[in-house]
């Protein structure tokens, strides 16, 4: 992922065809390690392709992947007494807000 991010940073920075050394420099600037094999693989896969098309293709693929949201939805209706728990949580949240607002300590940052 860091190799792809460094590649995109180079492209967004104006380098239409970043080299392996450019990507190594970007990753090295943040103190991360990188292996040359993953850089070469990425450069081979994206050579001659438009970055905007690659991003659009990736979005389509991610949209087709099922997310974990379906599991939570099917689990929620199975509990019969689930409706009573929700108001208790709201009351606790209100109490916490009051406690936080009482932490004035007698001074203001803007005075």
UniProtKB/Swiss-Prot annotation:
Molecular function via GO: structural constituent of ribosome
Keyword DNA damage attributed: no
Keywords annotated in UniProt: Phosphoprotein, Ribonucleoprotein, Ribosomal protein
Taxonomy, superkingdom: Eukaryota
A Pfam match: Ribosomal_60s
GO terms for biological process, alphabetical: cytoplasmic translational elongation
Basic and acidic residues: compositionally biased ranges: 88-98
The keyword Ribonucleoprotein appears for this protein: yes
Role of this protein: Plays an important role in the elongation step of protein synthesis.
Description of how the protein assembles with itself and partners: P1 and P2 exist as dimers at the large ribosomal subunit.
UniProt name for this protein: Large ribosomal subunit protein P2w
């Amino acid at each position: 992922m860091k190799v792809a991010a460094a590649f995109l940073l180079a492209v967004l920075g104006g380098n239409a065809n970043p080299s392996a050394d450019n990507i190594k420099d970007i990753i090295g600037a943040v103190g991360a390690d990188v292996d040359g094999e993953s850089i070469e693989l990425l450069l081979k896969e994206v050579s001659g392709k438009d970055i905007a098309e690659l991003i659009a293709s990736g979005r389509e693929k991610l949209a087709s992947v099922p997310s974990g949201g379906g599991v939570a939805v099917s689990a929620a209706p199975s509990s019969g007494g689930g409706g009573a728990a929700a108001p208790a949580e709201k009351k606790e949240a209100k109490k916490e807000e009051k406690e936080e607002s009482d932490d004035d300590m007698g001074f203001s940052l803007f005075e």
